[in-house]
Amino acid sequence: MGASFLNLVTTKVTVKGEEQKFVSLRLHQRFNRHHAFTVIVNYLSPSNTFKQTPEKFINYVGETVSISFAHKQTGESYDFEGVVTQVEMVGSMGEAGGVAIHGASPTILYENNGTLDSWMDQTLSAIIKEATQEYGKVPLASNPKYSAKIPYMAQYNESVFDFMNRLSAQYGEWFYYDGKKVYFGKPDKDNTEKIMYDVDLEEVRLVANLVPGKSARYDYVAQENKQHNADTPAKPDGMNDLQSIAHDCSEKAYGAKTTAAANPHIADKAGLDGQMKVLKNESGANLLNIRGIGKTCRIRIGEVIEVSFPGDMNLPPLGKFRITEITHEVRRDGHYANTFAGIPDGTVNIPVPDAKLPLALPELATVKKNDDEKEQGRVKVSFDWQKNGKTTNWVRVQSPNAGVSDAVSKNRGWVFVPEVGDQVMVGYEHGNPDRPYVTGAMFHSASGKGGDKNNKTKSIITRSGSAIVFDDETGSIVITDHTGKQLILLDGKDAITIMAKKSVVITNEDKSVIVMDEKSIGMQAETISIEGKKNITLVSGNESMVFSSEKNIINGSATNIKLEATKEYDLNTQTGTMKGTNLTVEGTANMTITGGIVKINS
């Protein structure tokens, strides 16, 4: 038979230093949850209740509540501090009256509405410290096992509590309140209470569950261009013998393996392997549970109990279990009882079944840096809600076309990295707020003017002012440099114009060159050919020379025409005439005139 005296406790409840004479008390505690309590204070009648001024009870809201249990015979005790969240003054049927004081663990102060914040290249410990720094009333012990720096982390429309709960789920960290202190990360306390069935417990249940445990995750690390894949390990860490049996049964039943994207984002294969180990350990925690009804407040949230049976039952111990949920109840007469649940003590990572994972939606940001140290075309952006100089880490920029080819090892495609100061739209891979990327840039009233009337103008203009402008009305294309004075115009009417303020140079690999500058045109090549199907006209000042295919003549309007060769000059024709008012043919050494018949003065 059980020892009934263990049920009797001395319970003390104080609010603002004032002890409350209560009718009943209930305190519910659970890992990754706010604890909740209700204390009913009996004032016997409505008149007695409402003789108390409402201001007195309203002023309880937000105040600290201290609750302590102490067994009368053994002195075993448990202390809890919370915060009053609601007070009810009740009158019922004209006969009964009382006050209900509702409250929660101090973690409720982390529920200061959803907010936005971010961290870059910080450890989990540093992130938790900064996220909670304005909540000094909540005693916190942060000692997460995960110690690597996280490239980028965002608190996205989440309360501090929901944010911490999510991180607890993603990184496999413990998160709970023990009555005095909030723990993020497994605490360094492993005291074990020996609990005996039928003495300390009215009821005990050992529960084995069928739990799926086979899964795979994948992730892509862009800065290394590496795809990582990993499966869950064969077995969870820290299993006891009974867990192992339950695990083998579950593995046989669930043969299929599920696949999902990694969450959180990882930096390397080791990070993904670690994530898979957390998933497996969390599934292992659900394989075997203990549940029961207890008579002693030595069963405490977060602590270990070792459950055994009386000697006359001749049964082996059930083993050690970590308490993850417990409800304490005390009646007016001091009768105490609790209901509890626990998982095997060897559990490394505790599952968080309903952690809220935020869904990030596209939003505006401003480019702060684009000088990517790894030369991968990435940028750092700042959202409107980021303060104190905070930005994202380096994020990728979406492009209509991007990649490599056999001929192009880098920058094949469309390369337009946004400029510092540009407004951009940011999306998120898998809706994950920790994985932003730039989807495109946005014009606004100070940066855009549209495509002119009828949306006729399309353009590409760089930071310096170099431009390609398309006109859909004329069909023209204009290419200009940053000065606007050097251009190539395709006018849409079968004409191309090339214009430069100083010179135009056309050259090829063999160094044939045409140079046009302000006052001259030069041509240089091994062979230069000029062909006119009818005429070729050369003009210099007021003088011109025409090469005519019809008249077979060179006609010069100049006063003098001089033909000169330093070695030989040959003039061949079937019939030729040299005319002049005065005509001199001279050979300074010799002159020879030959022909079939030579006529002089004939």
Residue spans of the language-model regions?
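Amphipathic alpha-helical and helix-coil boundary elements used as assembly
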Residues: 1-602
